[in-house]
Amino acid sequence: MSAKEIRFSTDARDRLLRGVELLNNAVKVTLGPKGRNVVIDKAYGAPRITKDGVSVAKEIELEDKFENMGAQMVREVASKTNDLAGDGTTTATVLAASIFREGAKLVAAGMNPMDLRRGIDLGVIAVVKEIKARAMKVKSSGEIAQVGTIAANGDATIGEMIARAMDKVGNEGVITVEEARTAETELDVVEGMQFDRGYLSPYFVTNAEKMRVELEEPYILVHEKKLGSLQALLPILEAVVQTGKPLLLISEDVEGEALATLVVNKLRGGLKVAAVKAPGFGDRRKAMLEDIAVLTAGQMISEDLGIKLENVTLDMLGHAKRVLIDKESTTIIDGSGEKAAIQARIQQIKAQIEDTTSDYDKEKLQERLAKLAGGVAVIRVGGATETEVKEKKDRIDDALNATRAAVEEGIVPGGGVALLRAKSALTGLTGENADVTAGISIVLRALEAPIRQIVDNAGFEGSIVVGKLAGSNDHNQGFDAQTETYVDMIEAGIVDPAKVVRTALQDAGSIAALLITAEVMIADIPAKDSAPAAGNGGMGAMGY
């Protein structure tokens, strides 16, 4: 076991704070409509240019192990906010840095860190309650477009495209984003289906950056039972290998020897394959497998129908233009099923919905209907260069996540105004002692941090703008950094999803409060490089 270096109290917190500030300084420049881009060097290919906070945070690894601990903790804030809300990562980082910075000062002044943490928790709970109370439901396609535009850094075409996509496939519909082969960004709605089953092994992953399987024009084998051995499957696997196309295997389960054999073949490059469990349970699973078979112009392989695995031929397999599989879901895009067959299946499900008296059955049938009839909206991102496409794709992903969050929990005034106005929830709120109350005041000050940063990035003085807004009784009034004017944020269409704002504050408060209570830090002592051997037996150059 290697020797450890230990840091205590103020020294430990100072090192943590330095790491937090380094990460915060790199991320905060991206905040707001006039936020700047960050250029990230890649091990291969062109550098990446992005304005996405979490993408910047994920790249930061510091040399000093103690400073790196602080940076990694705040990176966790950005990642968690991204996982839960899909946007607001820069706001979360700025909030976390502000809370920890103020908290570290008070701990250094002799206040109790545990009481400060209790105060921070109380403050965050009160503000979250206020944000939820002020959230307004999204009623129109125009409001969805506004949310998307703000999250895409003011790009109205992206906002409108996402609103159109949601119109076509519904708010809960499947919308995927992929790179186009042209310079234009376009929206396409294709026949498709998504179900909540992910890949059975991470070894099937083809896109390591996004941890997902991407299969182009695959064959699809739909099988009703479990697969424990591949013996019966060998003839059809060999036939698929001859075509050079990938294969998606959907069955009740793939386990043991069968799964191991598929993984080994995938790793060796002999067979491009992925396996997922069939969605649903019991009779519903069977019905959903039949839906998939109809959608992909394949046959469900079932012994009830007298079809055995060893007798399966290529023409019994389904086919689709593209399949995307991540850890939790599978999306089949543009299946080869005939429109008439799909429509007949849809009519059959509609008839079942009318006949059933069970609310539960009706709900599940409607889910199946939505999967078959809704289709999948595909946003194809175009650009002049690969770097431009990747940067635009980041913004579209953010905008898509933000609009979904807005539909879920409503919208609040954007530009940091919702957090600034939520300060009223902390007015008069006190704790059981002075230190707890001081913790509440840390949150009070932190609520100004995002709007100050947005204004600073626009080239103005944050204190002046915050002072002017504090003197206004209009809760929707804010500063439009794009036009450099004071406006009604809701009327101007500058809105944020309530879920994004709430999640950013909760995650920032949680991690920053933990950092404040840190008293000791332990890290490995870096290994000293062994001295290189001297040339010529240590005698130096001999002149020839």
UniProtKB/Swiss-Prot annotation:
Please state the Enzyme Commission number of this protein: 5.6.1.7
Q: Which GO terms describe its biological process?
A: protein refolding
Protein name per UniProt: Chaperonin GroEL 2
In its keyword annotation, does this UniProt entry include Isomerase?
Answer: yes
Q: So what does this one do?
A: Together with its co-chaperonin GroES, plays an essential role in assisting protein folding. The GroEL-GroES system forms a nano-cage that allows encapsulation of the non-native substrate proteins and provides a physical environment optimized to promote and accelerate protein folding.
Q: What InterPro entries does the record point to?
A: Chaperonin_Cpn60_CS, Cpn60/GroEL, Cpn60/GroEL/TCP-1, GroEL-like_apical_dom_sf, GROEL-like_equatorial_sf, TCP-1-like_intermed_sf
Spell out the Gene3D superfamilies in the cross-references.
GroEL (3.50.7.10), GroEL-like equatorial domain (1.10.560.10), TCP-1-like chaperonin intermediate domain (3.30.260.10)
Q: Which key words tag this protein in UniProt?
A: ATP-binding, Chaperone, Cytoplasm, Isomerase, Nucleotide-binding
Coarsely, its chief localization is cytoplasm
Q: How does it assemble?
A: Forms a cylinder of 14 subunits composed of two heptameric rings stacked back-to-back. Interacts with the co-chaperonin GroES.
* Annotated source species: Rhizobium johnstonii (strain DSM 114642 / LMG 32736 / 3841) (Rhizobium leguminosarum bv. viciae)
Positions binding ATP in this chain are T30, L31, G32, P33, K51, D87, G88, T89, T90, T91, G415, D496
Q: Which family does it belong to?
A: Belongs to the chaperonin (HSP60) family.
Q: What class of enzyme is it?
A: isomerase
Q: Which GO terms describe its molecular function?
A: ATP binding; ATP-dependent protein folding chaperone; isomerase activity; unfolded protein binding
Q: Which reaction does it catalyse?
A: ATP + H2O + a folded polypeptide = ADP + phosphate + an unfolded polypeptide
Q: Spell out where the chain crosses the membrane.
A: none
Asked if the Swiss-Prot or TrEMBL record annotates the protein with the keyword Nucleotide-binding, the reply is: yes
Q: Which cysteines are joined by disulfide bonds?
A: none
